[in-house]
Amino acid sequence: MKLLVATTNEGKYREIKEILSEYGIEVLKPEEKLEVEETGCTFLENAYLKARAYYERYKIPALADDSGLIVEAISPYPGVYSSRFYDIDFGGREEVRTNKDEANIRKLLRLLENTENRKAKFVAFIVVYGGSWGIFAEGEVRGEITKEPRGDRGFGYDPVFVPEGYNKTMAELSPEEKNKISHRGRALRKLVHVLKNCEKAF
């Protein structure tokens, strides 16, 4: 089976490819980036909007991921604004010095500076849309936010997120370790199970 991954985020694409290749699913990269306005109020809505847009452009079943971090002390933030948290009014805007991930992390740590409750969770919703059919799956991983970034692997908020049962941040884990426990990995494995039981998908 072939799926078009509706993203230009290299980190997301790499993780999705690594996990789905274990199940014999071939993933394709879009030839060009589509500007899809994420107007949904939820991760699921935004994933659907992206999957539908890429399917309509390429006529290949499209897989879209919308995911993010929810921090208990400032819930529902960063939430659906996770990738652009630095630039929203809540908590004040943060200057981008090197890259957006760094600015997002800097803002998050600033907001949690005097907060004892550092519980958080990563959430992922993944949609596959094929025109006449569509399916979705979700995954999450709970953990805590560190007081400073650690590790140089992964992307996004990985350097400040320690999953439950671990003493390393996501950015300190190997790709294999991360994919085994991550929100995206869990959602993708659920999705594969649904795909293999959905005759319309083949």
Curated annotation (Swiss-Prot):
Q: Which reaction does it catalyse?
A: XTP + H2O = XMP + diphosphate + H(+); dITP + H2O = dIMP + diphosphate + H(+); ITP + H2O = IMP + diphosphate + H(+)
Q: Which cofactor does it need?
A: Mg(2+)
The record places the active site at D66 (proton acceptor)
Q: Which GO terms describe its molecular function?
A: dITP diphosphatase activity; ITP diphosphatase activity; metal ion binding; nucleoside triphosphate diphosphatase activity; nucleotide binding; ribonucleoside triphosphate phosphatase activity; XTP diphosphatase activity
**InterPro entries of this UniProt entry?**
dITP/XTP_pyrophosphatase, ITPase-like_fam, RdgB/HAM1
Q: How is the cofactor bound?
A: Binds 1 Mg(2+) ion per subunit.
Write the signal peptide boundaries: none
Q: What is its EC number?
A: 3.6.1.66
Which sites bind substrate?
T7, T8, N9, E10, G11, K12, S67, F155, G156, Y157, D158, K178, H183, R184
The record's Gene Ontology biological-process terms are: nucleoside triphosphate catabolic process; nucleotide metabolic process; purine nucleoside triphosphate catabolic process
Gene3D superfamilies linked to this entry: 3.90.950.10
A GO cellular-component term linked to this record = cytosol
Provide this UniProt record's keywords sorted from A to Z. Hydrolase, Magnesium, Metal-binding, Nucleotide metabolism, Nucleotide-binding
Q: Which family does it belong to?
A: Belongs to the HAM1 NTPase family.
Q: State the function annotated in the UniProt record.
A: Pyrophosphatase that catalyzes the hydrolysis of nucleoside triphosphates to their monophosphate derivatives, with a high preference for the non-canonical purine nucleotides XTP (xanthosine triphosphate), dITP (deoxyinosine triphosphate) and ITP. Seems to function as a house-cleaning enzyme that removes non-canonical purine nucleotides from the nucleotide pool, thus preventing their incorporation into DNA/RNA and avoiding chromosomal lesions.
Q: How does it assemble?
A: Homodimer.
Q: Which PANTHER family match?
A: INOSINE TRIPHOSPHATE PYROPHOSPHATASE, INOSINE TRIPHOSPHATE PYROPHOSPHATASE/HAM1 PROTEIN
Designated name of the protein: dITP/XTP pyrophosphatase
